[in-house]
Amino acid sequence: TGDGEDVGYPGNDQSPWVFERKWEIDSLCYPIRLAYHYWKEVGDTSVFDSKWEQAMEAVYRTFREQQRKDSLGPYRFSRVTDRQGDTLLNDGWGSPVNPVGLIVSSFRPSDDATLFGFLVPSNLFAITSLRQVAEILRAVRNNTDLAGRCEALAGEVEEAVKKYAIVEHPEFGKVYAFEVDGYGSRVFMDDANAVSYTHLRAHETKA
């Protein structure tokens, strides 16, 4: 269930438009994917107004914030529940991560809490989405500043994936972990919901 039972930032004053405040990277990627392909298929640029531009600035800012380089950021989530996967440990901050350039996703697309905060398929999705945003910003809004920042962030996350998410499996050799923490911990699995490794091709996302 959602409204009224959660504690932590931003308190219990959540908007009626928000069912629950589980932070997932893909929640910001899907609107970008929809807008990008609408533009490519229809050619309509009227949707990319100043409000859209402000929203993309917020997406960029949120991704940067959730790299957790300077602090944990304002987001935390705690819920009274008998399911471990329905809340975050560590007083709502989730498992500790090493700020190596990857983006924290507190929850998976399945709504289960991540075991380790760096959910790799979602980071790969973010790379694709940031580059799609940059393409629109350059072609439609002539906003080279935000476009450049999005491209730089995509490149940083991509390099961090290569360095920290490709690990040695005792049986299969070098593989992508599903989640990592930047300290060396990793989990090998895939999740049923999209985006996951099974769905990457459908999301124009490369591993």
List where the protein language model places each region.
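A conserved active-site cap/scaffold subdomain adjacent to cofactor or substrate pockets
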Residues: P121-A134
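Conserved small/polar residues in nucleotide/adenosyl-binding loops
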Residues: T198-A207
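An acidic intrinsically disordered interaction segment
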Residues: T1-D3, V80-P99, K162-H169
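Acidic, glycine-rich loop-and-beta core segments that form the ion-binding/anion-interacting portion
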Residues: L146-G184
